[in-house]
């Protein structure tokens, strides 16, 4: 449960945590590791089994030396490399010296790089690769007392001492009732002990502290999966995505849930043709833009499938690169792509499609346009944009939209992103 800083978020989430009920280093080893080890090497296999069992029990420090010996014998074992990376990160949490912790975190990431090079692209390896290359770590709190309590809890957890970890996390929460990670980690420990009701209470507590952090939802989803409460688990995994959709790790829980339900996560195939490029300003300060028109849009009138309506989407963007953006965002000095701009363009397309349908000028509506119209009619157009078509500019508009329309984002993910794999 080691704190780390993802490159894409400020959240102080933890990496050293329970084995996932949805898929992990352990399950990967159990499924495929022995295929990769030379047949007849019982000693290697048995020691690998032992390391797995210790890991299952949360005894990371006991598993690490075994993994190190296995690595010395077979440096290319991708699963052993993953286990060593995870174990090394756990060991870092037990160290009181910040410089020593940094060195171990650097080592942990390097081992993850080696694991990936050896062919291991598991979710855990991808997560370990998000560790900062310089080994830096965020603090849990500006309060020295809270920080010390959290570090103590992390060290105890990494050593498999859950009782001491609980005591330290509780102390941190008493000192700071808004300490998200303390509530989160208390739920995590409860989950490991099979205390599901208590785990749920702690995860809910963390969510109440900060509903815009994804981890408590995702951990709670894992806990519900372990209980066989799959429908409720899906709800939590979706809420995790709503909280922080632009982190790779956020989608992990929902993706694994979907896979087990023979479903996939896939955005609607709606890709407007044409493009517009912002070329800055000329000598007089006037905006310069290049509009690229996909000529197939103009020729599509003969198809009578409505695809010529995409023409207005491209044209709508030209005004946004000029005065329209300044009018809508008077406090922003430089142009950026925005949710409002995308909404304007898509709504113009939808309006034109509906007008043509009314006039019976469309014989067979293009599937992408049919989906766009349906999404618009369901009031999910903005959710489609922020989830399926985000960029740096649109991401800036997400918090305000999320705070007002969580239900719409949940609906969009449930009805449009989760699709049957058949």
Predicted regions and their residues:
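Alpha-helical linker/edge segments of TPR/alpha-solenoid repeat scaffolds
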Residues: 90-101, 131-146, 257-283
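Eukaryotic alpha-helical solenoid repeat scaffolds
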Residues: 238, 252-422
């Amino acid at each position: 449960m080691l704190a780390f800083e993802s490159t894409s978020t400020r959240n102080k989430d933890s990496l050293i945590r329970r084995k996932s009920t949805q898929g992990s280093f352990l399950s990967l080893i159990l499924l495929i590791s022995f295929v990769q080890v030379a047949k007849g090497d019982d000693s290697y296999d048995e020691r690998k089994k032992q390391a797995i069992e210790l890991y299952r029990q949360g005894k990371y420090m006991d598993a690490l030396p075994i993994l190190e010996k296995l690595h010395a014998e077979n440096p290319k074992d991708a699963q052993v490399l993953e286990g060593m990376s995870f174990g090394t990160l756990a060991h870092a949490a037990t160290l009181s010296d910040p410089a020593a912790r940094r060195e171990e975190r650097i080592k942990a990431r390097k081992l993850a790089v080696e694991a990936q090079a050896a062919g291991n692209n598991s979710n855990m390896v991808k997560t370990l690769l998000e560790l900062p290359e310089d080994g830096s770590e965020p603090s849990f709190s500006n309060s020295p007392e809270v920080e010390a309590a959290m570090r103590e809890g992390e060290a105890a957890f990494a050593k498999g001492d859950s009782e001491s970890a609980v005591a330290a996390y509780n102390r941190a929460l008493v000192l700071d009732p808004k300490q998200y990670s303390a509530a989160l980690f208390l739920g995590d420990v409860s989950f490991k002990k099979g205390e599901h009701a208590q785990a749920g209470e702690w995860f809910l507590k963390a969510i109440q502290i900060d509903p815009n952090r994804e981890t408590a939802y995702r951990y709670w989803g894992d806990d519900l999966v372990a209980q066989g409460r799959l429908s409720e688990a899906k709800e939590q995994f979706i809420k995790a995505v709503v909280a922080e959709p632009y982190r790779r790790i956020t989608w992990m829980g929902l993706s694994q849930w979907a896979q087990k339900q023979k479903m996939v996560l896939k955005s609607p195939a709606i890709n407007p043709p044409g493009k517009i490029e912002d070329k800055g300003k000329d000598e007089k300060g006037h905006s310069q833009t290049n509009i690229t028109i996909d000529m197939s849009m103009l020729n599509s009138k003969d198809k009578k499938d409505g695809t010529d309506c995409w023409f207005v989407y491209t044209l709508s963007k030209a005004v946004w690169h000029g005065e329209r953006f300044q009018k809508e965002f008077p406090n922003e000095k430089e142009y950026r792509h925005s949710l409002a701009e995308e909404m304007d363009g898509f709504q113009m397309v939808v309006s034109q499609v509906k007008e043509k349908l009314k006039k019976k000028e469309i014989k067979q509506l293009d599937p992408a346009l049919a989906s766009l119209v349906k999404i618009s009619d369901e009031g999910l157009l903005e959710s489609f944009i922020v989830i399926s078509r985000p960029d740096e500019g649109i991401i800036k508009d997400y918090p305000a939209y999320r705070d007002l329309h969580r239900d719409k984002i949940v609906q969009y993910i449930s009805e449009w992103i989760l699709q049957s794999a058949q």
